[in-house]
Amino acid sequence: CCNWPCSFGCIPCCY
């Protein structure tokens, strides 16, 4: 999913 802060350009599955 998201490796770094979802604020960049990854899938916001950190929430």
Curated annotation (Swiss-Prot):
It comes from the Eukaryota. It is found in: Secreted. One of its GO terms (cellular component) is extracellular region. The keyword Secreted applies. Authors confirmed the assignment of this toxin to the M superfamily by cDNA sequencing. It comes from Conus parius. Probable neurotoxin with unknown target. Possibly targets ion channels. In vivo, intraperitoneal injection into fish provokes paralysis after 5 minutes. Both Pro-5 and Pro-12 are not hydroxylated, and Tyr-15 is not amidated. Its main location: secreted. Expressed by the venom duct. The cysteine framework is III (CC-C-C-CC). Belongs to the conotoxin M superfamily. Disulfide bonds join 1-14, 2-10, 6-13. Keywords: Disulfide bond, Ion channel impairing toxin, Neurotoxin, Secreted, Toxin. The keyword Cell wall biogenesis/degradation does not apply. GO terms for molecular function: ion channel regulator activity; toxin activity. This is Conotoxin pr3a.
